[in-house]
C-alpha cells in the first residue's frame, strides 16, 4: 500500500553535497580541518554544548553553584574550537567570493550563526557572574537558539546517496501536501471557532454566595465544586438556595483570573477548539456549556467536534504523513537497508527433528569453531530437550518473580523465599552460559546476537543477587528474562522480527524523537527558566518531563495553562502558539512516522505479492472442495438410498431394487425424448405436448443442450484455427504497414498512453500466438540476439503465468463441482440429509411455503428484454436499500430497534419487572423472534442442513439472545440481588442490539474484517502484556510498600500518622484566584491515614499490571510519575518514562499499524502490487468524477457572453472567495442584541448580502436560469443568497435576537461554500465525505456496541455513589447518560478514574442483600472486565479501523502529474471535451458520437488516426458492443479509456484480467471480421468496375432496355444480414449518398454523416447492421446544394430516415471542420480555468 507512489524514474546523478564536513580541497593550507578525528571531536563538542546550555539555568546554579563555573569553562573551550574552525573554513573557501564561499554555503552559515550564539551566551554569562545582569532577567532568552547545535552532531547520518533534484522534489511535494492539510485543519478550526462564538460566547456566569460584592470575589465566595450556571430560568443549571448566578467579569475578575479557555472571541475560540480536538479536557468544557446554555447545543457541538475534528480531520493528517513519507522511505531504502534473513550469510540450514517428531530447518554454521567439551555434551546442548528444559526454567522463574508481593512493614525483606529462588535460578542460567561457552568456544558463542543478550542477562543477574544490589536498578536484568520466552512460539518470533525489521529504521526514529525532545526541552528551558511562579521549567529534568508530557498528550493543557498564567496576558498568545505548534508536530507528524515505519515493515515485497495472490486463490479453491463438518458427519453412517416402492403389485412378483432418483431421471428423460419426437411429427405434436410436464421453453433448452454436445468437438477445433488465422493476418498487416514507412512524412510526436498500451498488447499477443517473424521498427536496425532472447524468456514467463491462472480457474470450477456432487450424493444416500429437524420432508409443501416467506425480498431492478442489462430507475439507491435484506429480516430489524428504544427507558428506578408498559416491547420481541426462528428452521434446518440457522457464530448468537430473552420473560424476577445470577441474566439481555449485526450483511462484513485479523491483534496483545509483565515485576520488587504515605503532607513517619488535620478542598480547575492576606482556602477536618494512592499501587503483580494497563492508554501516568518521584526518589521517574515511551511510541502505534494492515489484507489490498493498487485508486477516483456542470458560452459576443466571461474569470472567483471570508470575519464576536457593536456588524453583513445577490444575478444572466440550475454549487449559492435576502427583510422589520441568530446562520452557511471554491479543500472534504460513507457501518457498529455497554452499565453501575468522576453529569443512572459517559471513555477522557469510582466497596458504601437498586456500591470484578474490554475494543480496534478507511480513501486524491495513470489534468481535459460533445448536459451521448469525442481528445489520451487506426476501431466497437448501439454515459467512456491506458497484465487482478482479456479478444476478432468484410466489398467494387469497362459495348447496345427495366429492379447491394422492409423502402435515400474513401466511411464520421446514427425505438426488434457493415452505393446522381440547417447543428440527433444530406461532401466536411475548430477554441478559452474548481462537483 505504501510503496505505490514511488517515482518510476531512475536518475543517475552524483550524490548530494554533504555539507561543510566533507574534504574541502586537496591542496588546502590548513590540513587539520580535514582530519576525521577533528570532525568527530567537533560532533562531540556539539553534544557537550547542548549539555552545557541545559545546565545553564538560575535554579540549577542555586542547587549546584560550581556548575556556573563548569559551564563557563566548557563554553569558553567550545568557543575557541568552533571559532578556529570557522576561521579555517573562511580561509579555505573565501568569505564572499567564489562559488563555494563561506556565505554561499547554507551549512556554513548555520555553523557561523551557532558560533555567534555561543559568543553571545558567553558574554552574557560574564555579565551574570559579575552581577551586572540579574540571572532571573529575560536576557537569558538570548540562549534559545543554542540547543540547535545538536543538528551538527547528527548531520553525518543525513548523508544519503540520492540526487539533489530528487530530494528537492520529495521535500517540495511533502511540504505541499502537509500545507494543504494544515489549511484543511484551519478551515475546520475556523468553522467550529465561529460556531462556538455564536452558540456559546462567554462562560463567566458562576454560582456565588448571596452576599458576594463586586471586587471581593474569593475562593470562599464560590460553590464547592465551582459550578457554572445560566441567568435564563428555562435553560442550563439553576443555583441552589443560598447562591445566586452572577457574571464574575462584572464582579471584577480579570481575564487572566477567569482562565484563557472559552468562546469569548474568535482567537480564544480557535484556541479552545484546538484544545478540545486534542481530546484532552473537552468533556469538562461540555459540562460547563451544559450548565450555562441549552443542553442540546452542547451535545450537538462537542460530539460533532470530536467526531469531525478529532477523528476524521486529524486522521486525514495521519494519512497525508503516511502517504508523503512513503516515497521518502522508499528512496531511503538504500540508507536503512532491506530486511535480511534471520541467519547470517555464513550459516547454512539443515533439517532437524524437533521434540514433537516433526522436522524444522535449523541454522548450522559450518565454519563455527568447536569448543573443547566432549561430543556427548555438545549433542545434548544442541538437542531440543535441552532447549525446552531451559525455556521451561525461564517460565518457572518468570512465574516465581511474578508471585512476589508486599508482605507488610515488619517482614525482613533480604532473605525471603523469593531471594533464595532467584539465587538458584541465577546459578542455573550461569551454568547454562558456561556450558554453551565450553561447547562452542567463546568466539563461537559471542558471534550470535541471541547469545550476547543471554550473556548480558547472566552478568546482570549475577550482580543482582549480591545483597546490597538486590531490589535496585539491577532488577531489570532479572525481569528481562521473560523476553527469552518469545522463542517458544515461532509465529510470535517471526512477527516480532517482521515488525521491528532492520534495527536502523525504528532505531533512527527513536534517536530522532529523543533528540527532538532534548532540543525542545532545552529551548523551553531557556525560554521560561526566569519566569516566576512557574516551576515546570526551572531545571532540565523538569523541562524534559513537561515536554514529554505534551508529547503523550496527557495533561498537556495543564502545562500550557500554567505557563500562560505565569507569563502574563501580553505574551500568552505567543506562548500558546509555541505549545500548539509543538503539540501538533509531536502528536501528528511524529506518531504518524512511527505508524508509517511499522506499516512499511508489515508490507510484503513486490515479488511475493503476485505469488501470494495465486496461492490464496489456490487455497480458496481447496477450501471450497470440502463440505462443513456438520454435513460430513452423514458420511459416517451407512448409505440408505430411497428405493422404488410399487404399492399396487401383488406379492408374487419380486421388484428389483432400483433407486428412486434413478427412476425419476429415467421417467423425465423418456418424457422429454417422447415429447421432442412427437413435436417433429406434423400432426400429433401439439396434443402430445399438452400432456407433458415440461413447458416448450424447457424442451428447447434440452434440444439445445443435445445439439451443443454433438457439435462441441468440431467447434473447438475450428475456433482455434480461425482465431490463429485471423490474428496472424492482422499481425502481418500491422508489420507490413510499419515496414512500408507510411508515417515517414509526419513529424515526430510523443505517443499517447493509449497508443503505447495498444502496441504493448499487440506485441504480447503476436508472441503468444507464436508469430516468430522479426519485428523491425521504423528508423532502427534489427534487434540484437540477446534482446531477442530476453523477450522470448519474458513471454515464456507470461505464458507460464497464463497457464497457472487457467489452472487455478479450472481448480475452482472442479472444487465447486466436487462440492455439489458430494452434496447430491449425501442427499441421495441419506434420507435424513437436508430434512429440517429430521421431520419436514425436502420438498414438502410446508417447507416450500416457509422458504418463500423467509427468502422473499424487494426487487425493483428492471432488465432490458433485448439486451438483458439492468436498467437504473430513478430511485434505485432507495430500492437497493429496501432490497438489502429480506422482508422477514426487515421486520425483525424494526422489532429489534423498537425493543432497544424501549430498553432505553429502563433505569434502576423504572425497571422492566415493575413497569407493564416496558413489558409490551419485551413480549413483542420474543413472539416475533419465535416466529422468525421457527420459519427459518423449517425452511433451512437447525444444524445438520446445508443452509442451517446455526452454521456460524451469528446463528449461535441468535439462538443465545433468543433463549436469554425467553428465560427472562418467563422468569421476570421481582427481586434481583447484586452480583447474582438474575443480575447476570439482565446483563446478558443487554446484548440484544447485537442482533442487528447478524441481520444486516454489511454489519456481518465489519465483524468478519475485525475477527479475521485477530491473530495479529492477539500477537500484539501478547507483546504488550510481556512488556507490562516485565515492568510490573520490576515495579513490585522496587516499589512494593514504598508508595504508601500519610495523607497529611507534613507527617513523614508512619508512627506519627494519627489524629486529625485540616485538608484543603479543590474548588475550581479553571479559575486562578490568589489568596488574600489572612484568607484560608475552604477545607474540613479529616483523620490521618497511612495508605497507598487511591487508584494504584505496586504491592502485587495484579495491581501493578492494572496500573500499567491504565498508563498504557496514556491516562493517569502523570499521577503515577509524580507519586513515584515524590515518595521513592527522582531517579525512579526514569522507570515510568521508559515504559510510557515504549508503550506510546511503539505499543499503541503497533495497534494502529496492525489494524490498518489487517484491514487492507481483508479487503484484498495488502497483496496488491504497486500497479494493481494504483489501478484500484484510479477506478475509485473515476467513480466520483462527474461531467462539468457548466453551460456553454453564449454564441454571440453580446451582453450575456461578456457576463459569462466575467463570471468565469479566475479573478472574479477569487474576489468572491475573499468576500465570503470577509463576511465570516464579522462573526468574530457574538451577535448579541444588547451589545452596541452588533448593529454595525449586521449592517455590513447586509451590504455583503447585496453583493452576493449581484453575483447570483450575473451568473443567471450569463448562463441562463436553466444553465445556472445545472450545478449543485450554484443551487446551494442561490439557496443561501435567498435566505440572506429573507434575513435582510426580517432584520429591518423586527430587529430582535432571532433575526440576529438567523443572520449568523446565513453567514455560517455561506462559509461552507469556501470548500467548493478551493480545489485542495474540496479534495480533502471529499476524502472525509467518502470515508464517512464507507465507514457508515463501522460507525453504526460502534454505536451498537456502545448501546450494549450502556444497557449493561445501567444494570451494573446505575446506583453507584458519586465520587471523583461519577457526578451529576457523568453517571449510569439512565441509558442516555450512560451513552454520554461511554462516548467520553471512547476519547479516553479519565476513563480509569470512572472505572475506580465504579469499583467502590464497603466500608465506603452502603450494601444491600436483596436488590441491586437499593445499594450504592460498585462491582470490582464487573468494573474491571467492563471498562477494560470496552476501551480495548473501541479505542484500540474500532477507532483504528476509521484511521484505516481514511488512509485508504486519501490515496484516491494523492495524485500527481508524475503518476503513470490518468492524472487530474487528463481528467479535466476529458471533462471539457465531454462538455463539447454533450451539449445538452444530459450526461449521456449516442454511441455514434463516441468517435467524434475520441478524435477531439488531445495529450496523453489522444488517438492518432494515422498510427492507431486499429485501436480507434477497437475502442468504437467496444462502446457499441457493450451498449448495443444505445446511449453511453460519461463513466462508460471514461472507464473504457482507463482500461486502454494501463498495462492490464500488471494492473488487473486475476478474475478481472481474465474477463478483460476475453472481451478484448472478442472485440479484436469482430473488428478483424468487419475489416475483412469491408476489404472484400472493395474488391468486389473493383471487379465490378472492370467488368463494366470490358462490357461497355454491350452496355451501350442495351442502354435503352436498361432504362426501362431500372424502375422494376433494385440496385444491387452486398449485405451479410437480411434487410427489413423498412430498410428497402428507404434504399433510395441511402443510394443518394456520395461514395467516399473507406477511411472516411469507417473512421471519420463527419458532422453531417449519418452512418453512425441510432435507430428509432420502432426498429429495436429489427436486425441492425453491425459497426462497419457499409452498403455499396449505386451510381451517383446529381447532388442539389440545398441543405437543412439541422445537419450543420452539432447536437442534432436526426436519424438517416428523417434528414438526407444533399450537399457536396467536401464542402460539408470543410464547413463542419471550421465550425468545430472555432467552437473548440472558444470552449477552451472559457472552460480551462486554472483553478480547476469544477473538477469534482460536490
Swiss-Prot record:
Coiled-coil ranges (or none): 795-830
Highest taxon above the source species: Eukaryota
Quaternary structure (record): Found in a complex with NALCN, UNC79, UNC80 and NACL1; these auxiliary subunits are indispensable for the function of NALCN channel. Interacts with UNC80; required for the NALCN activation/inhibition by GPCRs in neurons. Found in a complex with NALCN, UNC79 and UNC80; UNC80 bridges NALCN to UNC79. Interacts with CHRM3.
Membrane topology: Multi-pass membrane protein
Keyword Metal-binding: no
Effect on the protein of changing residue 1390 to A: Drastically more sensitive to Ca(2+) block
Effect of mutating residue 992 to Q: Does not affect the voltage sensitivity
Noted disease: Hypotonia, infantile, with psychomotor retardation and characteristic facies 1: A neurodegenerative disease characterized by variable degrees of hypotonia, speech impairment, intellectual disability, pyramidal signs, subtle facial dysmorphism, and chronic constipation. Some patients manifest neuroaxonal dystrophy, optic atrophy, unmyelinated axons and spheroid bodies in tissue biopsies.
Regulation of this protein's activity per its record: Inhibited by low micromolar concentrations of Gd(3+) and high micromolar concentrations of verapamil. Insensitive to tetrodotoxin (TTX) and potentiated by low external Ca(2+) concentration.
Parts of the chain on the Extracellular side: 58-65, 130-137, 200-269, 290-294, 404-416, 469-472, 531-543, 564-569, 907-915, 973-980, 1040-1104, 1125-1129, 1228-1236, 1294-1296, 1358-1378, 1399-1420
Glycosylation, residue list: 210, 216, 1064
Cytoplasmic topological domain: 1-36, 91-106, 159-173, 323-382, 440-447, 493-502, 600-886, 940-947, 1004-1015, 1160-1210, 1261-1271, 1319-1331, 1448-1738
Reaction catalysed by this enzyme: Na(+)(in) = Na(+)(out)
Intramembrane spans: 270-289, 544-563, 1105-1124, 1379-1398
Keywords: Cell membrane, Coiled coil, Disease variant, Disulfide bond, Glycoprotein, Ion channel, Ion transport, Membrane, Neurodegeneration, Repeat, Sodium, Sodium channel, Sodium transport, Transmembrane, Transmembrane helix, Transport, Voltage-gated channel
Disulfides per UniProt: 207-239, 229-245, 1046-1057, 1405-1417
Stated role: Voltage-gated ion channel responsible for the resting Na(+) permeability that controls neuronal excitability. NALCN channel functions as a multi-protein complex, which consists at least of NALCN, NALF1, UNC79 and UNC80. NALCN is the voltage-sensing, pore-forming subunit of the NALCN channel complex. NALCN channel complex is constitutively active and conducts monovalent cations but is blocked by physiological concentrations of extracellular divalent cations.
Effect upon mutating residue 155 to Q: Affects voltage sensitivity
Protein's name in the database: Sodium leak channel NALCN
Post-translational modification: Phosphorylated on tyrosine residues.
Organism this protein belongs to: Homo sapiens
Impact noted for substituting residue 280 to A: Drastically more sensitive to Ca(2+) block
Cellular component per GO, a single term: plasma membrane
